[in-house]
């Protein structure tokens, strides 16, 4: 009971330490610094900066959070708020470089190495904050989060994002790399501030005490903050879904910009700042003749805390040790054994209560094989497609890993080719870097090559070609224009080693190549290349575009195209509508029906200008159906639930509905709330997720036949959809993923995400609420209705983040991506291979 009281007290304490308007972000900044260091390659003369930072993690981690230390009112009654503000901007970095060069010439002693490591942590914080808060730039993380989830209210999105980012970090990541000691170079900081201000502006006591408060806050976050996941998941689906991957201010992007500022800082430490352009905003610093014409503007961060820490200080004690130039903070352990034991015991009890000690026969928990990578953060399986690439009559697998990095080359991305045979894909575990049949690699810094893939005969020479999306090309220039590369195939079954066709976009933030599709758009029976760019301006902000290039024999082996010259194009209706987030093509009466999802679309047509913001439903979502080359949509399907995001996923096929073979379209609304009943009690499952099934006919708009729903809060049931005939009966099975599903019903208070994928037999589909007609006393019941339930072999792996099937001689194999798996390396991703049914 005492442990429970302490946990409750910690949650209350964090509410005081990080109230509304607080900067916070301690866990987030430490995670960014950790990722930036992973692939840093920075040797300057005799100094290997990666080794230096690894040696002095105590200083590096403390520095990555230090700029926010004087914001809280609990810190000396807030009188040094402006000192924190100044620590976020270029003049502080300039003063630090001058101070180090003047006082500590090479070779550096250990204290100076720690000072440099601390400074590198500060610079990571600087550039991360610019992108996260949209300081002097547009469409950074929090600005977009405000537009999507908070009726465009940045003041509401700001505290939810700052503190919510820490909640999400602690819920999703393991901080086993966290140093038990932090070092703050207090004496040197006094000197740097004197250099910056020309006078004494802060005391050593304030530096030590306020930094120590951050150390305490980190301790509190490690113990309890993850238990607030349900609260912040409800506040912002965007935060949960885009926290790592969002192109401008997501974790991956902030880590990329951290490595950039590290190179600039090392240059200045060696050469001084005379050959550098030093605008106020650190994101736009250039050195050595580089040019950057966009300097942005300085925008104040701001933030306040309330005054409560006594309970926490009493519990962990004050472990502070002074040295000649600095101070060490230490903790015996970042977790309390009693709390850890309590969490695990409760998790086991709840798990047994809800799922029992044995699994139903329909549950499949072990894949036939797993394909992995040995490098972290690769996002293996982010995009997948299947086709007979080598023309041997068997299905092959194409899989993207857009987060793939080398030392010094972060997020260049890769695409892997795995060939099948008469038995299907290899049914042994594979390290794809060593055993894939083919590898293509991106060549642009942080271009995220492999974010989308499609196979088609683009040059109409009779052999398949491969199109690859790299939507973050241009990131180093802050343009994020993106690119699509087409690699021609050959009659020998090999792909070109370099792209034959490059398609570019001129618009800033175009993110060209976010989604790709092969579909016959012009009616010549040859698949064409369809490109979705949901973040593209489209004449506004993130309206999104869908563009098609017709296949033809006129393309040369070194073709340069621009998306503005596409053969067919449509644009989103509203700002932040994200048209093209999902794409799907289906043949209806010998015509291609092209479907485009716009999951963050909202209906503003019936509201006057003055009342649009607060009265509109956020992100009900919409799907557009086109019969190209006509650009006017033939039909639209609109969501009716706020935050439902209808159109996030799309798929089609043929199933038996009440005994009649029917062509159907499935549309996912993975963040739609679901009504659940437990006996006579009714509750709302926030973001449980729903999937609609429509009948497709040649002469009329799609008509709703059935719905499927998830049975856990936040599970995002329907986030990924796929239809494929798994048993050769001429009917497609319906495959529905719930990648964020949590086994227990507390939705994050106990346990982790474990993800599930449901396979519904195509012969047994009924009209109406399929998962609501249950034998048990709990509804919905997707597990009761599914023929198979694939269980994640690893907690927290986002099992079901992508799904595809590959045809072998006898039956299809099901490939499930777990994009956050750490099977091969931390958060690298994995592919699980399943062969369902009796062999």
Swiss-Prot record:
Post-translational modification: Glycosylated.
One of the GO biological process terms: positive regulation of alkaline phosphatase activity
GO molecular function: glycosylphosphatidylinositol phospholipase D activity; sodium channel regulator activity
Transmembrane stretches, start-end: none
Entry's Gene Ontology cellular component terms: cytoplasm; extracellular matrix; extracellular space; high-density lipoprotein particle; intracellular membrane-bounded organelle
SUPFAM superfamilies membership: Integrin alpha N-terminal domain
UniProt subcellular location: Secreted
UniProt-annotated glycosylation sites, renumbered to this chain: 94, 271, 292, 307, 321, 500, 590, 658
EC number(s) from the headed UniProt entry: 3.1.4.50
First-listed, main subcellular location of the protein, grouped into a coarse class: secreted
Endpoints of the signal sequence: 1-23
FG-GAP repeats: 365-427, 434-496, 498-558, 562-622, 632-692, 703-769, 787-839
PANTHER family assigned to the protein according to its UniProt record, in alphabetical order: GLYCOSYLPHOSPHATIDYLINOSITOL PHOSPHOLIPASE D, PHOSPHATIDYLINOSITOL-GLYCAN-SPECIFIC PHOSPHOLIPASE D
Subunit architecture: Monomer.
UniProt function note: This protein hydrolyzes the inositol phosphate linkage in proteins anchored by phosphatidylinositol glycans (GPI-anchor) thus releasing these proteins from the membrane.
Name under which the protein is recorded: Phosphatidylinositol-glycan-specific phospholipase D
Organism per entry: Bos taurus
Gene name as annotated: GPLD1
């Amino acid at each position: 009971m005492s442990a429970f009281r302490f946990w409750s007290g910690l949650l209350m304490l964090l509410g005081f330490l990080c109230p509304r308007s607080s900067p916070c972000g301690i866990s987030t900044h430490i995670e960014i610094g950790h990722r930036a260091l992973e692939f840093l390659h920075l040797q300057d003369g005799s100094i290997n900066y990666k080794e230096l930072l690894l040696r002095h993690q105590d200083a590096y981690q403390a520095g990555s959070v230090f700029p926010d230390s004087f914001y809280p009112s609990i810190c000396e009654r807030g009188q040094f708020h402006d000192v924190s503000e100044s620590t976020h901007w270029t003049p502080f970095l300039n003063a630090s470089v001058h101070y180090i060069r003047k006082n500590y010439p090479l070779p550096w002693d250990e204290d100076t190495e720690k000072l440099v490591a601390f400074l590198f942590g500060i610079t990571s914080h600087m550039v991360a904050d610019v992108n996260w808060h949209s300081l002097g730039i547009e469409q950074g993380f929090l600005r977009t989060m405000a537009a999507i989830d908070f009726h465009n209210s940045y003041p509401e999105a700001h505290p939810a994002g700052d503190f919510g980012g820490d909640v999400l970090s602690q819920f999703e990541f393991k901080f086993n790399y966290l140093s038990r000691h932090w070092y703050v170079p207090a004496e040197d900081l006094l000197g740097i501030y004197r250099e910056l201000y020309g006078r004494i502006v802060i005391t050593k006591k304030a530096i030590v005490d306020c930094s120590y408060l951050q150390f305490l806050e980190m301790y509190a976050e490690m113990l309890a903050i993850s238990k607030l996941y349900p609260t912040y998941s409800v506040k912002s689906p965007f935060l949960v879904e885009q926290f790592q991957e969002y192109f401008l201010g997501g974790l991956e992007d902030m880590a990329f910009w951290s490595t950039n500022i590290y190179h600039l800082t090392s240059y200045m430490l060696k050469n001084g700042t005379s050959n550098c352009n030093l605008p106020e905003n650190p994101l736009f610093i250039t050195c050595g003749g580089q040019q950057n014409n966009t300097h942005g503007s300085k925008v104040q961060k701001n933030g306040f805390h309330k005054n409560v820490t006594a309970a926490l200080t009493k519990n962990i004690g004050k472990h502070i040790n002074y040295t000649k130039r600095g101070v060490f903070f230490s903790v015996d352990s970042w977790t309390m054994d009693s709390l850890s034991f309590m969490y695990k015991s409760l998790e086991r009890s709840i798990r047994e209560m809800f799922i029992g000690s044995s699994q139903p026969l329909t549950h499949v928990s072990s894949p036939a094989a797993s394909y992995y990578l040995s490098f972290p953060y690769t996002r293996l399986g982010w995009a997948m497609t299947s086709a007979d690439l080598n023309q041997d009559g068997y299905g092959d697998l194409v899989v993207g890993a857009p987060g793939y990095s080398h030392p010094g080359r972060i997020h260049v991305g890769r695409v892997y080719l795995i060939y099948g045979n008469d038995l299907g894909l290899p049914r042994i575990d594979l390290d794809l870097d060593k055993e894939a049949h083919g590898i293509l690699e991106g060549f642009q810094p942080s271009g995220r090559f492999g974010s989308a893939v499609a196979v088609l005969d683009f040059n109409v020479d009779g052999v398949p070609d491969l199109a690859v999306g790299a939507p973050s090309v241009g990131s180093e220039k802050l343009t994020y224009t993106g690119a699509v590369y087409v690699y021609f195939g050959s009659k020998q079954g090999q792909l070109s080693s370099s792209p034959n066709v490059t398609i570019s976009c001129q618009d800033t933030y175009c993110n060209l190549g976010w989604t790709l599709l092969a579909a016959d758009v012009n009616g010549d029976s040859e698949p064409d290349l369809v490109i979705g760019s949901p973040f593209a301006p489209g004449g506004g902000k993130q309206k999104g575009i869908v563009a098609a290039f017709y296949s033809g024999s006129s393309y040369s082996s070194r073709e340069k195209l621009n998306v503005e010259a596409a053969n067919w194009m449509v644009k989103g209706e509203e700002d932040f509508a994200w048209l093209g987030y999902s794409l799907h093509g289906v043949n209806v009466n010998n015509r291609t029906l092209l479907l485009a999802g716009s999951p963050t679309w909202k209906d503003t047509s019936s509201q006057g200008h003055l009342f649009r913001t607060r009265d509109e439903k956020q992100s009900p979502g919409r799907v557009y159906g086109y019969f190209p080359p006509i650009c006017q949509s033939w039909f639209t399907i609109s969501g009716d639930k706020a935050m439902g995001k209808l159109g996030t996923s799309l798929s089609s096929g043929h199933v038996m509905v009440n005994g009649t073979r029917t062509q159907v379209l499935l549309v996912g609304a993975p963040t739609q709330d679901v009504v659940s009943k437990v006996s006579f009690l009714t509750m709302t499952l926030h973001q449980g997720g729903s999937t609609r099934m429509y009948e497709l006919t040649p002469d009329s708009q799609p008509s709703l036949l059935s719905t499927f729903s998830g049975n856990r809060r936040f599970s995002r049931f329907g986030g990924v959809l796929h239809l494929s005939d798994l048993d050769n009966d001429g009917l497609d099975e319906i495959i529905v993923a719930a990648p964020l599903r949590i086994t227990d019903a507390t939705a994050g208070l106990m346990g982790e995400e474990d993800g599930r994928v449901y396979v519904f037999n195509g012969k047994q589909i009924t009209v109406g609420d399929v998962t609501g007609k249950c034998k048990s006393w709990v509804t919905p019941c997707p597990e009761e209705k599914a023929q198979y339930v694939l269980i994640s072999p690893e907690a927290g792996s986002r099992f079901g983040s992508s799904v595809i099937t590959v045809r072998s001689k006898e039956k299809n194999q099901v490939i499930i991506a777990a994009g956050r798996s750490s099977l091969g390396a931390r958060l690298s991703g994995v592919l699980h291979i399943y062969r369902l049914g009796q062999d």
